[in-house]
């Protein structure tokens, strides 16, 4: 879809909120951090940005 997802691994605490809220399963927890594994599926809805308590996700 043309959206770029960046997770600041220094800020990410691995809470999984982005994993739970994403409607197209862009994220996966790996080694205790959120990783965008299906970035090409991103709809740009920004739900992940809104729920991240650490502001670790940038679109």
Curated annotation (Swiss-Prot):
For this record, an example GO cellular component is:
periplasmic space
- Which residues does the annotation say bind [4Fe-4S] cluster 1? 12, 15, 18, 52
One MF term in the entry's GO annotations: electron transfer activity
**Which Pfam families has this protein been placed in?**
Fer4_10
Specify the superkingdom: Bacteria
InterPro entries, alphabetized = 3Fe4S_ferredoxin, 4Fe4S_Fe-S-bd, 4Fe4S_Fe_S_CS, Fe-S_Ferredoxin
* Residues that bind [4Fe-4S] cluster 2: 22, 42, 45, 48
Q: What is its main location?
A: periplasm
- Localisation per UniProt entry: Periplasm
The 4Fe-4S ferredoxin-type domain, residue ranges: 3-32, 33-59
**Which UniProt keywords are given for this protein, alphabetically ordered?**
4Fe-4S, Electron transport, Iron, Iron-sulfur, Metal-binding, Periplasm, Repeat, Transport
Cofactor(s) of this protein: [4Fe-4S] cluster
**Cofactor: how bound:** Binds 2 [4Fe-4S] clusters.
* SUPFAM superfamilies found in the cross-reference section: 4Fe-4S ferredoxins
Q: How does it assemble?
A: Homodimer.
Physiological role: Ferredoxins are iron-sulfur proteins that transfer electrons in a wide variety of metabolic reactions.
Query: What is the name of the protein in this document?
Result: Ferredoxin-2
Source organism: Desulfomicrobium norvegicum (strain DSM 1741 / NCIMB 8310) (Desulfovibrio baculatus (strain Norway 4))
């Amino acid at each position: 879809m043309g959206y770029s997802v960046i997770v600041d691994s220094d800020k990410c605490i691995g809470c999984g909120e982005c994993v739970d809220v994403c409607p197209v399963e862009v994220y996966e927890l790996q080694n205790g951090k959120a990783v965008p594994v299906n970035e090409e599926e991103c709809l740009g809805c920004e739900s992940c940005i809104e729920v991240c308590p650490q502001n670790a996700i940038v679109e």
